[in-house]
């Protein structure tokens, strides 16, 4: 039920922005409900428990057997610091903000109808998958976003984003 409400809110915001003929960067407001939904989750998806019990404590304690990308490690340290070393809420929030930023950029640059794209995002498996595999979802969106550089023959930019 919450997905239906969040989808409706996001689509309404997007439609209002289009009707008021506001500049396209205001469409980011339509992505805020999705960002909050992902950030406010707790014990949703397999990665929440795995991250909370094994991976995040391992990274914070410097265990070398925990394999995380360099950016993901920095997100863990920053989120834990922002939470005053009390909880992992900010870590999951930052991960979801990064994901939603790339989704927003990709959709806003490639979609003719952002409301429909939001609907497809929420009714496909990608958004719900992102609640179980946040780092994989971020990697996928960065790769999709970076494809524009291949189209423009800017291979270095593409490699920079996916590297």
Residues of each region from the PLM?
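Short hydrophobic/aromatic helix or loop-helix immediately within or flanking a transmembrane segment
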Residues: 49-57, 63-84
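Membrane-interface transmembrane helices that cradle and orient dolichyl/undecaprenyl
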Residues: 143-156
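Membrane-embedded helix bundles of polyisoprenyl
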Residues: 115-133, 137-144
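Transmembrane-helix motifs of polytopic, lipid-linked glycan transferases
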Residues: 94-110
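Loop-to-helix entry region of an early transmembrane alpha helix in multi-pass inner-membrane enzymes
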Residues: 82-98
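Transmembrane-helix signature of polytopic, membrane-embedded enzymes
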Residues: 22, 28-29, 107-124
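Start-transfer (signal-anchor) and selected internal transmembrane alpha helices
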Residues: 1-33
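Membrane-interface alpha helices of multi-pass inner-membrane proteins
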Residues: 126, 155-163
């Amino acid at each position: 039920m919450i997905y239906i409400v969040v989808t409706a809110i996001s689509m309404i915001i997007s439609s209002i922005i289009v009707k008021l003929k506001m500049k396209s960067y205001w469409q980011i407001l339509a992505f805020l409900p999705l960002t909050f939904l992902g950030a406010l989750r707790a014990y949703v998806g397999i990665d929440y428990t795995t991250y909370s019990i094994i991976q995040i404590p391992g990274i914070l304690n410097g265990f070398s057997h925990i394999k995380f990308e360099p950016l993901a490690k920095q997100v863990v340290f920053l989120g834990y610091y922002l939470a005053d070393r009390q909880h992992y809420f900010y870590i999951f929030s930052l991960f979801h903000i990064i994901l939603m930023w790339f989704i927003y950029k990709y959709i806003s640059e490639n979609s003719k109808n952002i409301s429909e794209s939001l609907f497809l995002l929420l009714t496909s498996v990608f958004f719900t998958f992102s609640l179980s595999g946040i780092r994989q979802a971020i990697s996928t969106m960065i790769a999709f976003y970076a494809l524009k550089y291949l189209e423009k023959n800017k291979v270095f930019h593409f490699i920079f984003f996916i590297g």
